[in-house]
Amino acid sequence: MEVSKLSSAFDIDLVFPEGFSFFEPYLQYFVREVLEIGGEAYVSRAFGGNISGLFIYDEFEKYGTVFTRSRKVFDYFCGLKPFNFLFAELKTEVESEVYDIYSIDLENRDIVHRFSHEISMADDGQLSEIERFMVLAHPEINRRWTRVALKNGDKCFTVRLDGEIAGLGWVSFVRGIGRIHSLFVKPEFRKLGIGEDILYARLLWLKSNRARFAFSEISRNNAPSSRIASKAQMRPCGQVFQYYMKSLVSNEPLKR
């Protein structure tokens, strides 16, 4: 196995074998994003030169994602960097948190919803406010991420109540495919239908931009988001597993 570090998303021909990853249309996008926020990316190749794995890593947040079907490659990348948690499509015997990948065919499905709240799309002028909200939602977040995401074309949809952001959610759009992610509603504004409105706003935006397909990774521990996705006729089509350093090092079940 040969492993090389990427200095640019475009400095290497990232041609992946068929069936390599559900996220294949997004892999080059993910590499670009992680490098622009100060992270690292590595690619492994098997004998013959075919790509066998991809690893992206954010030093600030101490998290990584391994894209591979090989346990050998998975184990190698797990030991490459210190991390608090790591995502992978590969299921192992090690305890993990399961995320279901919900998807929807936007070409052949109508999106109909009655909104309860006004939805806005954030712009660069709201960058500082969005950054502060993202830190509230994810205290360990790499603060470079918000600026990079907006620069690269991600859209942030917000709902305001009482003069402040009550909730927001992000959407990426790559190669005709939408990724719905990073929803957060402040606790005091939950159960008001904000999350549902933000989901439908993103689906409608994608459909208006002729997206063929959309997906979202949702933890099985997040019952409200799973219910909202199901109500929007999104259906599970795959899984991602979140591993924690303690479990991988000890190879024991995670104690919650």
Where are each of the predicted segments found?
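Short amphipathic alpha-helix that is part of the acyltransferase structural core
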Residues: 1-27, 108-141, 255-256
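N-terminal charged segments
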Residues: 1-82, 139
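Acyl-donor-binding surface of acyltransferase catalytic domains
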Residues: 48-117, 240-247
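Glycine-rich acetyl-CoA-binding "A-motif" of GNAT/NAT acetyltransferases
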Residues: 50-51, 164-167, 224
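A conserved beta-strand-loop-helix scaffold within acyl/acetyltransferase catalytic domains
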Residues: 57-59, 138-187
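Conserved active-site alpha-helix within GNAT-family acetyltransferase domains
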Residues: 76, 89-97, 196, 220-238
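Conserved hydrophobic beta-strand within the GNAT/NAT acetyltransferase core sheet
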Residues: 180, 214-218
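Conserved acetyl-CoA pyrophosphate-binding loop and the N-cap/start of the following alpha-helix
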Residues: 189, 193-201
